[in-house]
Amino acid sequence: MEADGAGEQMRPLLTRGPDEEAVVDLGKTSSTVNTKFEKEELESHRAVYVGVHVPFSKESRRRHRHRGHKHHHRRRKDKDSDKEDGRESPSYDTPSQRVQFILGTEDDDEEHIPHDLFTEMDELCYRDGEEYEWKETARWLKFEEDVEDGGDRWSKPYVATLSLHSLFELRSCILNGTVMLDMRASTLDEIADMVLDNMIASGQLDDSIRENVREALLKRHHHQNEKRFTSRIPLVRSFADIGKKHSDPHLLERNGEGLSASRHSLRTGLSASNLSLRGESPLSLLLSHLLPSSRAGTPAGSRCTTPVPTPQNSPPSSPSLSRLTSRSSQQTQPQAPEVLVSPDRDDIPRVVIHPPEEDIEALKGQEQKNEENTDFTPGILASPQSAPGNLDSSKSGEVKGNGSGGSRENSTVDFSKVDMNFMRKIPTGAEASNVLVGEVDFLERPIIAFVRLAPAVLLSGLTEVPVPTRFLFLLLGPAGKAPQYHEIGRSIATLMTDEIFHDVAYKAKDRNDLLSGIDEFLDQVTVLPPGEWDPSIRIEPPKSVPSQEKRKIPAFPNGSAPVSADPPKEADHHAGPELQRTGRLFGGLILDIKRKAPFFLSDFKDALSLQCLASILFLYCACMSPVITFGGLLGEATEGRISAIESLFGASLTGIAYSLFAGQPLTILGSTGPVLVFEKILFKFCRDYHLSYLSLRTSIGLWTSFLCIVLVATDASSLVCYITRFTEEAFAALICIIFIYEALEKLFHLGEIYAFNMHNNLDALTSYTCVCAEPSNPSNETVELWERKNVTAASISWANLTVSECKTFHGMFVGSACGPHGPYVPDVLFWCVVLFFTTFFLSSFLKQFKTKRYFPTKVRSTISDFAVFLTIVIMVAIDYLVGIPSPKLHVPEKFEPTDPSRGWIISPLGDNPWWTLLIAAVPALLCTILIFMDQQITAVIINRKEHKLKKGAGYHLDLLMVAVMLGVCSIMGLPWFVAATVLSISHVNSLKVESECSAPGEQPKFLGIREQRVTGLMIFILMGLSVFMTSVLKFIPMPVLYGVFLYMGVSSLKGIQFFDRIKLFGMPAKHQPDLIYLRYVPLWKVHVFTVVQLTCLVLLWVIKASAAAVVFPMMVLALVFVRKLMDLCFTKRELSWLDDLMPESKKKKEDDKKKKEKEEAERMLQGDGDTVHLPFERGSLLQIPVKTLKYSPEKPVSVTINFEDEPSKKYMDAETSL
């Protein structure tokens, strides 16, 4: 019985059928102006001409525009003829098809273009037990936030859970309630009057209680944030400033009236600068260029006119309200909108808008020419969208007021009460949706209204934040059912945040469209059993919101389902134009230059960010240590021919040139292990055969440079498309593991130098000694050293020597406190371990600080960007304060060659025989493969689609720069540098850009990488200047740099699918994450794929760690062939999920053919919306009127045309299917 009663209450007095159209409101004044319309004009005015939406494919669908009823008037007989032509409104079997049709239509105006929505729900309640007021109880930007019952605070954002019953009740409300679409009103008073008039006319509301309902609707709105701002000093803030950050740029240009038209109205209308120029009392102005206007009326297409009060459309104006006139507002010129001026009052903020600087002179001149003076009379401060410019220009457009100056909450904007922190989270151009629900004692049955305003209007005081209101939902009912009304309000608010219903609400033409949107939403709803889920539990927002595109894709024209249910995958990383073979000499290089040249200046402008400074400091510290370490190892291997200073100079020179001119400046160059192995083998060969090492190395380097340039000329970089994820991840994982291994190895190596004494006897600590003594069996080298220093063993006071002096004279340490390399050094090793792991964990913690709950967002973001640099500074300071002598970074202090016998220019021949110039081509071939593979695999990893790079890649240009600088370094006797995988990945990770404007509860979206050249350029410039910064760099402990290596290696492993698949070996199936490839590939095949990849990784590790490391690039190349063999064990569908499909020449041709056919199909559909053009033989073109096409969801469109072949006078038939 209770349910029946509730249903009876929901049923209005005057029932209406579901086929009845919603009221398309023509504005407040349409009911008051005595304008007579013919019956046929009224019918044609409401007619909507629907173009049939014919889907050709999922990617490209022809959309027919709705013809606006304002411009096309047709008689009823025209509609009958349309039916005879076969242009019928399509029938839809499901709400989903109806919704897809609605979303597939486009409108000529901007009033139905969807915007982001902020939804607020207010409930009518008592305040202090005395009077009613609307109190904000919930809001939605992306997820729901509620005002907590027990405290004045907002809840955490959560996923809204709705009861199914409330959704059905909402559907009943839309079905039986008042629906008014495209209402033109400027104040809440006008909206209330029009809604109530419609309710009375339809019998939903009794005229006797009209004033009671109107009074309830116009009650004050109390927002949650107002208490926090009561004690704050009012802010003096201009609308222009607000508009820069939070308003829609299209708001100024809505319906064809742009900023230029507004400036024209400034010049021809009233002069807004009079006040400031004449020095009058400060007043608050709203200029015409902030007022969105509607279409029509004027030659420019705008309808912003100076309203003229008439007895028919406005009550008596208050003394404080006057209208502003100018000479330009009388005849045919566009009339300036009425500008209302507020008095100098304390409770209204002063908002002063200054005209653009370029218009000041024009305004001054116009002011002198004006013959009529404009009088400014204090009045109400109108909101930007509540001015009468929103009303129809063909009708009266008077600001609604009353004797007391109108409703203040609807006419003033107090920015001192605006929560600007929340305002920043609202996207640009957002509009508001207000939900008003409540219970009153004078109603016997609920009244419901759904209103869509056109255009959106800023109703001050109605919404928590000053954004224009687009939708209003009203539900007032008798007392006793407040929870029911609350749930219905939550339902409509949640629906407005749904991506599909949100678009339907903007594009709906009648009530049925809204009902279809609700039905489609119900089709997608998941119901949880009440006994298995507690609805009071708040669901945390997901990290990533699933895409709703599948709900927008219509079924195939013949009603069949797609062949595969697999979700669409993004294009492979090698599908871009950068790796397509041109067939011309240096063709790929020329295209790279053309592609990157337009971005050259922006590569420097885009670096104006604090994030780039953090990246420079981080990567500088990260690059310094491996370069110096590599130089030291190279110095040991070549007996000082090439050492640390050459390594620093070579890295700086190569890095600067590469950062300036390379195709992908995000890549960081560095030294590699195979290059070091090659240098060792080459030096040993030259020493055994008495050849000049530097000269032979120069010859090999020049040959390598030449061969790399040949690869550039022949577009060999296009072969990179055969390097799939399988090869990339094996190579990247190996480099990351090497970084981790070498960081730990260096830490253990410190244990050999700074050994610690084990198994100590604490009682015998006072007897532990370690002194220097004469070596018992001095070597020949030691004797020669003594002779050079003119000393003998007997003349040296061994017991009095310091540790360094004892090592200089090759003394021997004797005593119980002595280790293998000297006395035990207390605490150094353990302190190094503390520095090492503290650096790693602190860097990781600070990098993730962006997601913590402490401090403002800007502070967290800055700490995250400077994470590694802050860690280094903190650890250096702690090390300095503790004072334990940990090993420090050693940088050469002089800029000169390590070997005094060599210079900065090396001859390719030198003392070597002439034939060495020719034989050098053989090892150069091996070096070419090494350089090519290292460079291009790293480039492929950097240019992956996951990084969302927008400026394109430049594989050919990258290889050219590496080749040129390799030749330069060879001539100068400097080490060779190539792309460093881990450093490049760390560089990219440090420049990730995420969305700043995110709704509460929504995770920031990854937008891409800050692509620029400055970070790499500054890193290598600082590296070259390091020789002059030794006084600062000498304080950096080496364990801290080793900890940075560990952090880079571990952080670079994130996102590698290979390691995610390795984790699956130890997980039961029920605990495995919902990885996409596990849905489509059997688990045992995933394990087989992982085992093969792991085996290849182990083989690469063994080869790289052995003396055969010089053939390491050949083994990386072999991975491509291993991947090709996997086609025999896996299907292409499985490999498409586990890896990228290998490119095939036949597949490319077929793909090109499909693309060409698609372009042809799109070209056929170009032109006006009433004709389809089909090419025919001998250049003929068939034109088919769209109205002859009949669409049925069960079968494809088929058109048969008879036409005459002119030359042969024969009749032919042509048939096409769409």
From Swiss-Prot:
The chain crosses the membrane at residues 613-633, 642-662, 700-720, 730-750, 822-842, 866-886, 913-933, 959-979, 1016-1036, 1039-1059, 1097-1117. GO terms for biological process: auditory receptor cell development; bicarbonate transport; camera-type eye photoreceptor cell differentiation; cellular response to growth factor stimulus; cochlear nucleus development; locomotory exploration behavior; phagosome acidification; purine nucleotide biosynthetic process. One of its GO terms (cellular component) is cytoplasmic vesicle. It catalyses: hydrogencarbonate(in) + Na(+)(in) = hydrogencarbonate(out) + Na(+)(out). Keywords: Cell membrane, Cell projection, Disulfide bond, Glycoprotein, Ion transport, Membrane, Phosphoprotein, Sodium, Sodium transport, Symport, Transmembrane, Transmembrane helix, Transport. Residues 1138-1140 are annotated as: CA2-binding. Residues 634-641, 721-729, 843-865, 934-958, 1037-1038, 1118-1218 are cytoplasmic. Glycans are attached at N176, N274, N410, N780, N790, N800. Residues 60-77 have a biased composition (Basic residues). It is found in: Basolateral cell membrane; Apical cell membrane; Cell projection, Stereocilium. Belongs to the anion exchanger (TC 2.A.31) family. The PDZ-binding motif mediates interaction with the CFTR, NHERF1/EBP50 complex and probably with USH1C. This is Sodium bicarbonate cotransporter 3.
